[in-house]
Amino acid sequence: MPFILFLICSLFINPIFARVIHYELDSFADIATLYEEMRSDPRSTLLVFDLDDTLITMTQPLGSVGWWDWQAELQKTGKDPDKLFTPDYQQLVRIQNILFQLIKMEVTDKYVLPFLNHVTDQGAIILGLTARGKDHLSATMMQLKDNNFTVGDKLLFQEKGLKFRNNKTSLADNFQCPQFSKEVIYQRGIMFLDGEDKGQALLCVLSKIKTEIKTIIFVDDAKRNSVSIDKAFTDRNDLLVLNVLYTKENTKELEIQNNPLIQQQLFEQWNQIKNHLNEIIVQSNF
């Protein structure tokens, strides 16, 4: 721990070296400790959070990150087609959205909300950065409200989020990032990327805001997103970026992707849901 403190202090003294520092943590108590030891000005600090398996997680395997990654990989590789829920990507998105509506989510750690409330009370700014697309916007808002990510009747991300040069904190239209081919949406403090690169997305956001950000804490459960942040910010000498790989849910994700028994159970659960949908919806596409 003294070494970490020394390293961080040295970065502030010598800004030319202030690039990206990597961490691998499995609790928000540890993230809170990291934040406190950093001792940066909260008003120039941006905390960026992934949603799925970082802030919130499915209460059962069906519809979870592990389930999605398993199915998406099967579609990509063409391997084991008999294990696919559907060979069509857009249909898989629709299935995911149904499961989001049916299955409850919960916070990944009991310290998630206390930490977010604490840092935002100090003046820190927060941003949600999710791989979900616009199709999941309604379900996402419902899940966050159900788990008390709110300040009064507003989402915490909206109330304590970024302020853009147009003085808005919630853009109802598309978020224009020229490097992206897919439609990216920013609403109520959350950026819906539809799978686009998170490092490039964060660079795009920073180019459009009013606030001067000096420190970023990025927290995500996926290694690929940690790598993306590293590539995007490794040459940014004006920022200190703490790149946190949050690993608490990773074992659960891998088990879903590699355990045939769990996979069979997921098929059976989905078939029950699908049959029920076919009974109540005429000419269901499922």
Residue ranges with predicted function:
Residues 198-229:
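Conserved Lys-Pro-Asp/Glu-containing loop-to-beta segment of HAD-superfamily phosphomonoesterases
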Residues 250-286:
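Low-complexity, Gly/Ser/Thr/Pro-rich intrinsically disordered linker/tail segments
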Residues 19-176, 189-192, 257-261:
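Alpha-helical substrate-recognition element adjacent to the catalytic core
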Residues 13-15:
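N-terminal signal peptide c-region/cleavage motif recognized by signal peptidases
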Residues 128, 218, 243-245:
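Structural beta-sheet core signal
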Residues 64-76, 229-251:
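A short alpha/beta connector and helix-capping loop motif
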Residues 1-8:
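Sec-dependent signal peptide recognition
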Residues 142-149, 206-210, 230-239:
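Short, surface-exposed basic-aromatic patches at helix termini and helix-loop junctions that form
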